[in-house]
Amino acid sequence: MTAQTPIHVYSEIGKLKKVLLHRPGKEIENLMPDYLERLLFDDIPFLEDAQKEHDAFAQALRDEGIEVLYLETLAAESLVTPEIREAFIDEYLSEANIRGRATKKAIRELLMAIEDNQELIEKTMAGVQKSELPEIPASEKGLTDLVESSYPFAIDPMPNLYFTRDPFATIGTGVSLNHMFSETRNRETLYGKYIFTHHPIYGGGKVPMVYDRNETTRIEGGDELVLSKDVLAVGISQRTDAASIEKLLVNIFKQNLGFKKVLAFEFANNRKFMHLDTVFTMVDYDKFTIHPEIEGDLRVYSVTYDNEELHIVEEKGDLADLLAANLGVEKVDLIRCGGDNLVAAGREQWNDGSNTLTIAPGVVVVYNRNTITNAILESKGLKLIKIHGSELVRGRGGPRCMSMPFEREDI
């Protein structure tokens, strides 16, 4: 990394030097059973314990010499002038689907009154309950304000924010600022926009943009993997479509970030396998975790770029052989989540046994609860850093989902 390139990520396994997290906040306490599906949750984590688990995760990374950054802090540091701060508030409000002009005005006044930038950022993440707003005089209400909904929020919370992998993805020295699958999560990308536009270190054009949140097709960071300095992997999944991948790849190749080929993985389109990194992660030079249930239906395409055109070939051979050839290793070991036991594989994949964070070649952060997968990984010679995640896992994401590398050593 240099002063001109504050982002440097050319692998999934190079020694991790700097990483972005988001400590779960009050947005988690704004989950309620009636609206879990709307907010893309299956259950409600207990915030106090989720924070303890997340703090332990962050400390485990620090203990390995990794600098931990926080999304909420970088976003606050990006509001460098009163004008930028006000522009952020107005853009946040314009994307918040607020019902009623008077309600929007009341929320703007509430946010403008918050003096501390980090408190402001955390409030925008938490959402706004209608009960927090002053009673609006009938004479000021528009029709939308008068037709009162029983929905308790004036602005939805963003409970998925602790999965920092998805709103944007670091690729080489650039960043893909994503357009996300759902309206609920697409608002999360606003923080990345302000960080990479205005932050003293990461803003001001220092980081090339290879995808923009204003695109109309969807892509999420869980489907963007950097296998080596030459090869990327992308998932065509429930959350990422092929049109987005084509746009991303053209931009990456045109901006000369150094990548020569992309492997596009097409697999089952459902919540259980929402991203590529929930079923497939790299843990060493020649080792990957994989969920066995995707192997039969998996299709892989090789994509290269020449004469300003993408060239796409469907790969017909064995996946392990394909990966070995593209990574320049003799053989690749695909380590099955849950081993060969169908029940264990299903249970441990649901609990993110395949969603590992590699912090150095062969050194992997995992949830301790996935005992069968962990035992297999250890039998393959991998060093595991095991963290508790009984509350964090309720959001359906593991250590890779909860982290966004900003700097890795080259391999």
UniProtKB/Swiss-Prot annotation:
An MF annotation (GO) of this entry: arginine deiminase activity
Catalytic machinery residues: C401
Biological processes, Gene Ontology terms: arginine catabolic process to ornithine; arginine deiminase pathway
Post-translational modification (record): Glycosylated.
Annotated keywords: Arginine metabolism, Cytoplasm, Glycoprotein, Hydrolase
One GO cellular component, as annotated: cytoplasm
Catalytic reaction list: L-arginine + H2O = L-citrulline + NH4(+)
EC class of the enzyme, as a word: hydrolase
Main location group: cytoplasm
Transmembrane residue ranges: none
Cross-referenced InterPro entries: Arg_deiminase (IPR003876)
The protein's Enzyme Commission number: 3.5.3.6
UniProt family annotation: Belongs to the arginine deiminase family.
Matches recorded under NCBIfam families: arcA, PRK01388.1
Protein known as: Arginine deiminase
Natural source organism: Streptococcus pyogenes serotype M3 (strain ATCC BAA-595 / MGAS315)
Gene designation per UniProt: arcA
